[in-house]
């Protein structure tokens, strides 16, 4: 509910602050006094785009601020919480429009975009009578109002959940299909996998194969080296290592009794001869193992060639081929499972579509019943409001495609025939602001008691009417004010007299510049204002008495 409105340097307003309470608040004043500036200010606080022309002449910027009590307004609280802009039970909207054309907006003292301001405002205030900012002109808002009237929350939630589930499954399937044709990919990888599986790719085996290749490739050199080394260690001549060691050992044995340390040298020489013997034994074994086999060497080289070719193909080393083979096998298995998963997804998508259709059918039946009831009730109210022969039709139109839609299987269009014999036209195409306001009023009254926006603003609802019809309009607005906060700009005394609170806007010259001023009227001032609205500038006793009678009738309601 709107609690406080501040308007500064806006159009012809220098600075006004208004307090609002529950019920119906009326705003009256002479033509050109600036009555609609309050509604304009709320419009800009609701996200309407503005230019520098709204800034008061001579000022640098216009400042607008509105404070709302959202204690019991669930939708606004949820919206604020979802975007992390909540601040308890209060909500402040603020807008600055600069003379250079710039503009900034805040929600609860935090900067926001105009889009965010507009989104939140749809949960706080609804302005009727201005084409560019009337919620009921939106087909989506019409659908929401119809569902609210039908109390379809459970059915609509079921449809939304079913559509969301269907879309999630579809997205999952699309993501899998985006990876390409599974069968082609599987065939390609399986061909490569077969090539890898023909070879023994064990890293230890490949390492041993490389070692064997090196031996085979250098067998002749190895044999020659073994022969030469054996000859050096134990040849037939006196220069072999083993012969020289024996000679040295013999020389020391003849003199070792003269120096005990020579015994240690003899021990070392004995060990050296033992090691030479062991080396000769190993050399003989290696020599016997070394056989030149050209066929074996060729076979080894062919196998190594295949391994290196596979390694180049898969961009890895031969030792990494086993890991590559395992990865590819896992990928094939995964893709085979993916193919099965796609089939399962298709089945689940079909089931999700069936569930959505079932939920949407229930919602459609409820909407059809509600549309007929709301049309009848609103049509009666339209006629009461002076639009004789007017008729509201609520048309349910199927969506152009069969895809599950979160809002159900149909769209809504409110059609209005304002005069007998005229074909119904979409509500959004009504040219007359007064007719549009009265139709909106009738729809709102028909939906009394339902959970809609807390603050409703009406402008031009009394255009082109008077007398008994004006009295009916006032009664309907007051009845609406029992359920919601209503702000109504009016020039009809019958409507003004029905308000719970009454403000008067007037023009005052200050330093040769016309400015708008607004004041809250007490009972006496209110009677004077209604008398002025009845009789003009010169208030007669009859007008004063008639004003008193209108206010007395209000007390008796």
Curated annotation (Swiss-Prot):
<dbReference type="InterPro" id="IPR004604">
    <property type="entry name" value="DNA_recomb/repair_RecN"/>
</dbReference>
<keyword id="KW-0227">DNA damage</keyword>
<dbReference type="GO" id="GO:0006310">
    <property type="term" value="P:DNA recombination"/>
</dbReference>
<dbReference type="GO" id="GO:0006302">
    <property type="term" value="P:double-strand break repair"/>
</dbReference>
<protein>
    <recommendedName>
        <fullName>DNA repair protein RecN</fullName>
    </recommendedName>
</protein>
<dbReference type="Pfam" id="PF13476">
    <property type="entry name" value="AAA_23"/>
</dbReference>
<keyword id="KW-0234">DNA repair</keyword>
<dbReference type="GO" id="GO:0005524">
    <property type="term" value="F:ATP binding"/>
</dbReference>
<comment type="similarity">
    <text>Belongs to the RecN family.</text>
</comment>
<dbReference type="GO" id="GO:0016887">
    <property type="term" value="F:ATP hydrolysis activity"/>
</dbReference>
<dbReference type="InterPro" id="IPR038729">
    <property type="entry name" value="Rad50/SbcC_AAA"/>
</dbReference>
<dbReference type="GO" id="GO:0043590">
    <property type="term" value="C:bacterial nucleoid"/>
</dbReference>
<feature type="binding site">
    <location>
        <begin position="29"/>
        <end position="36"/>
    </location>
    <ligand>
        <name>ATP</name>
    </ligand>
</feature>
<dbReference type="InterPro" id="IPR003395">
    <property type="entry name" value="RecF/RecN/SMC_N"/>
</dbReference>
<dbReference type="Pfam" id="PF02463">
    <property type="entry name" value="SMC_N"/>
</dbReference>
<keyword id="KW-0067">ATP-binding</keyword>
<dbReference type="GO" id="GO:0009432">
    <property type="term" value="P:SOS response"/>
</dbReference>
<comment type="function">
    <text>May be involved in recombinational repair of damaged DNA.</text>
</comment>
<keyword id="KW-0547">Nucleotide-binding</keyword>
<dbReference type="InterPro" id="IPR027417">
    <property type="entry name" value="P-loop_NTPase"/>
</dbReference>
